[in-house]
From Swiss-Prot:
Its main location: membrane. Three calcium ions are usually bound at the interface of each cadherin domain and rigidify the connections, imparting a strong curvature to the full-length ectodomain. The chain crosses the membrane at residues 622-642. This is Cadherin-8. Coiled coil: none annotated. Cadherins are calcium-dependent cell adhesion proteins. They preferentially interact with themselves in a homophilic manner in connecting cells; cadherins may thus contribute to the sorting of heterogeneous cell types. Residues 62-621 are extracellular. The lineage of its organism: Eukaryota, Metazoa, Chordata, Craniata, Vertebrata. GO terms for molecular function: calcium ion binding; identical protein binding. Residues 30-61 form a propeptide.
Amino acid sequence: MPERLAETLMDLWTPLIILWITLPSCVYTAPMNQAHVLTTGSPLELSRQSEDMRILSRSKRGWVWNQMFVLEEFSGPEPILVGRLHTDLDPGSKKIKYILSGDGAGTIFQINDITGDIHAIKRLDREEKAEYTLTAQAVDFETNKPLEPPSEFIIKVQDINDNAPEFLNGPYHATVPEMSILGTSVTNVTATDADDPVYGNSAKLVYSILEGQPYFSIEPETAIIKTALPNMDREAKEEYLVVIQAKDMGGHSGGLSGTTTLTVTLTDVNDNPPKFAQSLYHFSVPEDVVLGTAIGRVKANDQDIGENAQSSYDIIDGDGTALFEITSDAQAQDGVIRLRKPLDFETKKSYTLKVEAANIHIDPRFSSRGPFKDTATVKIVVEDADEPPVFSSPTYLLEVHENAALNSVIGQVTARDPDITSSPIRFSIDRHTDLERQFNINADDGKITLATPLDRELSVWHNITIIATEIRNHSQISRVPVAIKVLDVNDNAPEFASEYEAFLCENGKPGQVIQTVSAMDKDDPKNGHFFLYSLLPEMVNNPNFTIKKNEDNSLSILAKHNGFNRQKQEVYLLPIVISDSGNPPLSSTSTLTIRVCGCSNDGVVQSCNVEAYVLPIGLSMGALIAILACIILLLVIVVLFVTLRRHKNEPLIIKDDEDVRENIIRYDDEGGGEEDTEAFDIATLQNPDGINGFLPRKDIKPDLQFMPRQGLAPVPNGVDVDEFINVRLHEADNDPTAPPYDSIQIYGYEGRGSVAGSLSSLESTTSDSDQNFDYLSDWGPRFKRLGELYSVGESDKET
């Protein structure tokens, strides 16, 4: 490195020395009167110099200097002398002092204030700053007063070759298609040099390839890289590394250089055809494989990549073109052979296919290399499998008359085992499709028979499923749908299509159509319905009505005369015989009711029956019934509301201390120790059911044959309890169907420990007047009150 720097300095100083000899007037210490020989500087500097010349020539004073230069990167033991300042006002008496200011004054440049010598005290770098602008001024040494106006000058840093070229964007990557012709442009690179491009050759660059030949070349000045060999093959080598050098000084010796790398990748083109790895492929497949299943894969290799390697696969020949197909798998770049139709080992055991692989994207530039396709042979062997039974037909359609006899054969299904072993077949009906079990099937021969009667009018079609099962392998089953159509037979007689009721006006005219009726038949003859209408033989000579057949298969009833009188006869019944056209024909008799009504002159019914009244206002019988029901419901609600108000205002029983609530007899202190504690409920005696004529009882009644009972008269509200009980007792005494009990009450403990025992022994078949209760007084004071109740005094009898 020091040797190279010395050579560079020598190259620079040589022209400077020559310039020093030939141009003595350009020395930077020249006096002011010789400054006119300057040839450098800006127009402003030249103008200012001319102006100074005019001033100095007039006053004989002024600055003397040149534009100064200093060499960059100079490093010596002493500060380098840049130049000297001098004015003609300086007689050499050292009374003038020079002052320097501006860029780098005092830090980079120093001035001797007495002599005016300027030195550079630091190493300069032109790439950092190329020139410095300074200001010089001469002042009186003692007073520091300016002797001349200040003036600017420039110190330029002279360049040396101290910067090597650099590739700022490296390393580089580029692509070029394979098989390119010679001289195909790949890319271009650019290097920069920080040295001065104007001064010398320090920044003049020359490019060259250090590594990458003989495949690539580079233009020395433009740095354009091109292919140096034709038809480079990506399949042989895909990537190349090129080392590029940029050298300054025009590439001469002593110049600085920089390098970078360029990676060149060859892109693929379709220059290779597909090629099968083998010419013959073998595959095997069971005969019961599902359609669409992949049987095998074939692949044609292609040295190209991407879309250039894509191939389409086709079956171009063979005896299985109808059974197999091949599809292209773009991901795996192979062909998938799939089953297209069912196979049968018993029919054919092997197949041969010829498949072809062809490139999809063809480059016409390489068509001379031959067809971009290849073929291979595929052998497919069918393997035997235990197959399910096969029916002779995929569906069956059977017909049966609805009057077919039970156990008669409707039809037959057949199935076989396609295997070589040929297992026997057993048939059955899927009962989920025949829930009513209307059909049976012979398990051996598949004959379908009728199990229950059929009715076409209920169901025309029956869809069942027949199952065929191999006897040797019950897992092998097949199903087939069977549609059974029920054929019609004439088993239904025709009848009126609806309920007809005709109305005849008293003032009707002879021949007037009273009613038009139509018939219906549940049967379905092939040629359609055709009905015959007639009157009963005894009604053929009917003096009042006649019938007329219409073309639309309907019947009109006509009046033979006028002058009908509904007072004499209000209703006429006309039996009509309806016959169908079946074989044999069936007939039925339907009766038409004809009512005689009073009508207006224009034929409007005015008085006949309920329906005749509602017809003019447009109301049907259903609407009338609905209106009446609403009215009745409203009346019931009103009655219930009034009844509830009366019960609320006038209660039946006054709940006070005098009310008899516990027993019929009120025992004060006398009954403190009695044992009959069964409560007496007055509400039971006032049971509404009893009022309506039915008396429910809690006692167990004897098993007797009862006679109808008379209804009980209702009891008015607000009556005395004593009178109420007497009325009930009288009713019970006169009731022949009543069981032998005194009352409807249950006395669980009454009479226990008493001399008389229970009151149930008392006879109640007679009235109070026929009974003698005097013996009750002998029972003691405990029954005194009871004896008074059942005894009849003279006052009572008189009453």
